[in-house]
Swiss-Prot record:
Species whose genome carries this gene: Synechocystis sp. (strain ATCC 27184 / PCC 6803 / Kazusa)
Oligomeric form and interacting partners: PSII is composed of 1 copy each of membrane proteins PsbA, PsbB, PsbC, PsbD, PsbE, PsbF, PsbH, PsbI, PsbJ, PsbK, PsbL, PsbM, PsbT, PsbX, PsbY, PsbZ, Psb30/Ycf12, peripheral proteins PsbO, CyanoQ (PsbQ), PsbU, PsbV and a large number of cofactors. It forms dimeric complexes.
A GO BP annotation: photosynthesis
Stated name of the protein: Photosystem II reaction center protein Psb30
Record's bilayer topology term: Single-pass membrane protein
TM ranges: 10-35
Annotated function: A core subunit of photosystem II (PSII), probably helps stabilize the reaction center.
Family as reported in the entry's similarity comment: Belongs to the Psb30/Ycf12 family.
Length: 39
């Protein structure tokens, strides 16, 4: 069970990290646009 849990957690962490990157990209653009109006 421990080996299966480790194998199953790796893709979950990778998908979570990828999701954070996908959400962080537009978030940074919106924050910069609202704060300064210039990128």
């Amino acid at each position: 069970m421990e080996l299966l849990a480790a194998l199953n957690l790796e893709p979950i962490f990778q998908l979570t990290f990828l999701g954070l990157i996908v959400l962080a990209g537009p978030a940074v653009v919106f924050v910069l646009a609202f704060r300064g109006g210039d990128l």
